[in-house]
């Protein structure tokens, strides 16, 4: 009876070792689970970005307001008869904001 008990104990130890430390064991499972969670978070961020880009594309395809807004903001374009004014902060405020941005 003693040899059978030792054999079963050895098999149990071997199975536990392979469960915890072997290939596809608990450690591999937790590592893969963490990798999947990180990838899902990245995918969620990218999906939100894609949704935003698709909304912008739809807006640009659908109407003139988005094109006009973009032309005014990025290219400083104006309509005939309009005057474009750009407000530039004075030097002390620019130095303060530059100092805060460098932190």
Curated annotation (Swiss-Prot):
Keywords, alphabetical: Cell cycle, Cell division, Cell inner membrane, Cell membrane, Coiled coil, Membrane, Transmembrane, Transmembrane helix
Stretches in topological domain Cytoplasmic: 1-3
Membrane topology of the entry: Single-pass type II membrane protein
Coiled coil ranges: 31-71
Major subcellular site: membrane
Topology, Periplasmic side: 22-103
Localization per Swiss-Prot or TrEMBL: Cell inner membrane
GO CC terms of this entry: cell division site; cell septum; plasma membrane
Keyword Cell division belongs to the record: yes
Record-linked Pfam families: DivIC
Ranges annotated as spanning the membrane: 4-21
Gene Ontology BP, a term: FtsZ-dependent cytokinesis
Keyword field contains Cytoplasm: no
Family: Belongs to the FtsB family.
HAMAP family on file: FtsB (MF_00599)
Function per UniProt: Essential cell division protein. May link together the upstream cell division proteins, which are predominantly cytoplasmic, with the downstream cell division proteins, which are predominantly periplasmic.
Summary of subunit composition and partner proteins: Part of a complex composed of FtsB, FtsL and FtsQ.
Protein name as it appears in the record: Cell division protein FtsB
Species this chain originates from: Escherichia coli O1:K1 / APEC
Gene name as annotated: ftsB
